[in-house]
């Protein structure tokens, strides 16, 4: 995970001091790109332990089109709790936009189903794009999309994905985002009969919160370990048919977790 650690160090050393929506304060750079060859191992940060259950269940929750934290709570995932209302609702966030984008005529569009069909139908298309940034519904969202747009690319029988993330919490959020979209790429590839290529992660405002500086420095003292391997149940060929039990991360032996507060 050298690209991630290089970002962490660069922002610590060269980032600009900025205020932010949460009032915490950040150190930030604008415009950064990382590339991960998914054939070299699953890109999961090893210099601190990540909560795999949260990463997997959150992605399955997105793919269900769900926007209520009930499913997450039932599976001991708490990463969205701070933003939910008293009924557990978050408004029309990622799952709604991925599976039920509402057009100007009121018709709902299943972007993810369209994507799978289009990859099979026209793998050379330059329009294999999914957006969560639905301007008309942004005010209703508990949190506007940070990872807002992603595109797939097929060449030589391999599927690659590029994510544009407008805002990236480097210490807490970005490691989750890398793993989540790498997992999604593997799942879409299996559902479309393709191998995997690269995951490219492009960040707009890449920032470290001021109350994460010491944790970031601690992480940079640790030596990265071998990347784990992702195993998907080969019998699942429907993107929306994956369950938690169909996804396994093998050989993950990270350094201990490093606690840090979430900026809300």
From Swiss-Prot:
The keyword Cytoplasm applies. The active site is at 146 (nucleophile). Keywords: Cytoplasm, Methyltransferase, Nucleotide biosynthesis, Transferase. It holds the Pfam family Thymidylat_synt. DUMP binds at residues 21, 126-127, 166-169, 177, 207-209. It is found in: Cytoplasm. One of its GO terms (biological process) is methylation. The keyword Transferase applies. One of its GO terms (cellular component) is cytosol. Signal peptide: none annotated. Its EC number is 2.1.1.45. It is an enzyme of class 2 (transferase). (6R)-5,10-methylene-5,6,7,8-tetrahydrofolate binds at residues 51, 169, 263. One of its GO terms (molecular function) is thymidylate synthase activity. Pathway: Pyrimidine metabolism; dTTP biosynthesis. Belongs to the thymidylate synthase family. Bacterial-type ThyA subfamily. Homodimer. Catalyzes the reductive methylation of 2'-deoxyuridine-5'-monophosphate (dUMP) to 2'-deoxythymidine-5'-monophosphate (dTMP) while utilizing 5,10-methylenetetrahydrofolate (mTHF) as the methyl donor and reductant in the reaction, yielding dihydrofolate (DHF) as a by-product. This enzymatic reaction provides an intracellular de novo source of dTMP, an essential precursor for DNA biosynthesis. This is Thymidylate synthase. It comes from Xanthomonas euvesicatoria pv. vesicatoria (strain 85-10). The lineage of its organism: Bacteria, Pseudomonadati, Pseudomonadota, Gammaproteobacteria, Lysobacterales.
């Amino acid at each position: 995970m050298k690209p991630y650690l290089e970002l962490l160090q660069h922002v610590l050393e060269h980032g600009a001091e900025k205020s932010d929506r949460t009032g915490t304060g950040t150190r930030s750079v604008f415009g950064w790109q990382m590339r991960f060859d998914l054939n070299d191992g699953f890109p999961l940060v090893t210099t601190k332990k990540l909560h795999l259950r949260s990463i997997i269940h959150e992605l399955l929750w997105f793919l269900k089109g769900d926007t209520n934290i009930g499913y997450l709570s039932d599976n001991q995932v708490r990463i969205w709790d701070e933003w939910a209302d008293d009924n557990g609702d978050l408004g029309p966030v990622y799952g709604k936009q991925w599976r039920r984008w509402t057009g100007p005529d009121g018709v709902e569009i299943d972007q993810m189903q369209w994507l799978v069909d289009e990859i099979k139908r026209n793998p050379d298309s330059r329009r294999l794009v999914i957006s969560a940034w639905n301007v008309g519904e942004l005010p209703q969202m508990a949190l506007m999309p940070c990872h807002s747009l992603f595109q797939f690319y097929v060449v030589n029988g391999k599927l690659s994905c590029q994510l544009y993330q407008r805002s990236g919490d480097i210490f807490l959020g970005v490691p989750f985002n890398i793993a989540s979209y790498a997992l999604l790429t593997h799942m879409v590839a299996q559902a479309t009969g393709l191998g995997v290529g690269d995951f490219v992660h492009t960040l707009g405002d890449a920032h470290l919160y001021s109350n994460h500086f010491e944790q970031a420095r601690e992480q940079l003292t640790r030596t990265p370990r071998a990347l784990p391997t992702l195993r998907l149940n080969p019998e699942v060929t429907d993107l929306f048919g994956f369950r938690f039990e169909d996804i396994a991360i093998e050989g993950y032996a990270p350094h201990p977790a490093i606690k840090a507060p979430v900026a809300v």
